[in-house]
């Protein structure tokens, strides 16, 4: 069987368990002729065990015959950091005002979740990547 030709790659961020045909999903998939409800049902089934509402980056490959496959990534580091320190948003002045403090243990936990999507060589490097994200959000980092 010949390999299908990829016609488009669509990158979206969709809330776990809450995919529906309304924007931004509907228009993004509709313009490529993808079965929108098919994607929504499949995505919601795969994210059933996850925390509802957690943003999940998804990469949808659309083939020339209008079929599709999708790959889910790990949640954004900023979401995981905000969840770990229980804040709604980062600081508007990151290096001057701090919204909270995060420990090395919390950073390690986030790094383990993000590991498949990070290019870090080891856990320590992954922790430093996550710590940098935390600092840029105005979170004080302890133990790194």
Curated annotation (Swiss-Prot):
GO cellular component: cytosolic large ribosomal subunit
Coiled coil segments of this chain: none
Post-translational modification (record): One or more lysine residues are methylated.
UniProtKB keywords: Methylation, Ribonucleoprotein, Ribosomal protein, RNA-binding, rRNA-binding
Listed InterPro entries: Ribosomal_uL11, Ribosomal_uL11_bac-typ, Ribosomal_uL11_C, Ribosomal_uL11_C_sf, Ribosomal_uL11_CS, Ribosomal_uL11_N, Ribosomal_uL11_N_sf
GO biological process: translation
Superkingdom of this protein's organism: Bacteria
Pfam families: Ribosomal_L11, Ribosomal_L11_N
Single GO molecular function: structural constituent of ribosome
Family per record: Belongs to the universal ribosomal protein uL11 family.
Subunit structure: Part of the ribosomal stalk of the 50S ribosomal subunit. Interacts with L10 and the large rRNA to form the base of the stalk. L10 forms an elongated spine to which L12 dimers bind in a sequential fashion forming a multimeric L10(L12)X complex.
Biological role stated in the UniProt entry: Forms part of the ribosomal stalk which helps the ribosome interact with GTP-bound translation factors.
Name of the molecule in the record: Large ribosomal subunit protein uL11
Organism field: Francisella tularensis subsp. tularensis (strain SCHU S4 / Schu 4)
Gene: rplK
């Amino acid at each position: 069987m010949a390999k299908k030709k990829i016609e488009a790659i669509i990158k979206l961020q969709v809330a776990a368990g809450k995919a529906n045909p309304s924007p931004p999903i509907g228009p993004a998939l509709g313009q490529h002729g993808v079965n929108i409800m098919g994607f929504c049902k499949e995505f919601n089934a795969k994210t059933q065990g996850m925390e509802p509402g957690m943003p999940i980056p998804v990469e949808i490959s659309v083939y020339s015959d209008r079929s599709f496959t999708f790959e889910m990534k790990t949640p954004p580091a900023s979401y995981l950091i905000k969840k770990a320190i229980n804040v709604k948003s980062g600081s508007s002045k990151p290096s001057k005002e701090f919204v909270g403090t995060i420990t090395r243990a919390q950073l390690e936990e986030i790094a383990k979740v993000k590991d498949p999507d990070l290019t870090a060589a080891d856990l320590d490097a992954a922790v430093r990547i996550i710590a940098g994200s935390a600092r840029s959000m105005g979170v004080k980092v302890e133990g790194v």
